[in-house]
Amino acid sequence: TVLDKSGKYATVYMNHDRPAQVIYQAVACNHQHQVEWDEYAAFTNTIERKHFLEHSIAQPKLTRASLIKQFLKPPLYSQQYLRGFGTLYTAAYDVAKGRVQIIWPEKQVEASFTRFEEQEVQVVLLKPVGRYLAK
């Protein structure tokens, strides 16, 4: 999903066995037009996450900061890493300022589109608790 400075958005669906398709919707998750693999959709909560996003952005008092916070907790934030699925980071683009924030629950970094400087960042995705990993 992309957004320009005027606020216009589009989502591009790409797949190996069909042509790319531009859809004018503001959100995207782990499925395209419809679910094609029920087990994967259930595992990733793709339908729930899409509905959550659509409901969130329809709220008239939604702020940028509150939307970003929603990406850092379920259902949008997932920690099923040991099962092969999870949120690695959230990217919050500010196209008017030409900046991006890369965000984790306990850390964030910023970068400029025009004066990009490479950064090295270490994050802990799952914290060990005794012999086990916390969820």
What are these regions (language model features)?
Residues T1-K135:
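C-terminal, well-structured catalytic/ligand-binding subdomain of enzymes
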